Amino acid sequence: DCLGWMAGCDFNDNKCCAGYVCKKHPWCRYDL
């Protein structure tokens, strides 16, 4: 199971769904 838009991911990209990043913030966001 992966986390989608604005889900809490604790700075761990691996928790986010494909296309989302979490490196510099605590939420999954679009990888622009």
UniProtKB/Swiss-Prot annotation:
<dbReference type="GO" id="GO:0017080">
    <property type="term" value="F:sodium channel regulator activity"/>
</dbReference>
<feature type="disulfide bond">
    <location>
        <begin position="2"/>
        <end position="17"/>
    </location>
</feature>
<keyword id="KW-0872">Ion channel impairing toxin</keyword>
<dbReference type="Pfam" id="PF07740">
    <property type="entry name" value="Toxin_12"/>
</dbReference>
<feature type="disulfide bond">
    <location>
        <begin position="9"/>
        <end position="22"/>
    </location>
</feature>
<dbReference type="InterPro" id="IPR011696">
    <property type="entry name" value="Huwentoxin-1"/>
</dbReference>
<keyword id="KW-0960">Knottin</keyword>
<feature type="disulfide bond">
    <location>
        <begin position="16"/>
        <end position="28"/>
    </location>
</feature>
<protein>
    <recommendedName>
        <fullName>Mu-theraphotoxin-Se1a</fullName>
    </recommendedName>
</protein>
<keyword id="KW-0964">Secreted</keyword>
<comment type="similarity">
    <text>Belongs to the neurotoxin 10 (Hwtx-1) family.</text>
</comment>
<dbReference type="GO" id="GO:0005576">
    <property type="term" value="C:extracellular region"/>
</dbReference>
<keyword id="KW-0800">Toxin</keyword>
<dbReference type="GO" id="GO:0090729">
    <property type="term" value="F:toxin activity"/>
</dbReference>
<keyword id="KW-0738">Voltage-gated sodium channel impairing toxin</keyword>
<keyword id="KW-0528">Neurotoxin</keyword>
<keyword id="KW-1015">Disulfide bond</keyword>
<dbReference type="GO" id="GO:0008200">
    <property type="term" value="F:ion channel inhibitor activity"/>
</dbReference>
<comment type="function">
    <text>Voltage-gated sodium channel Nav1.7/SCN9A inhibitor.</text>
</comment>
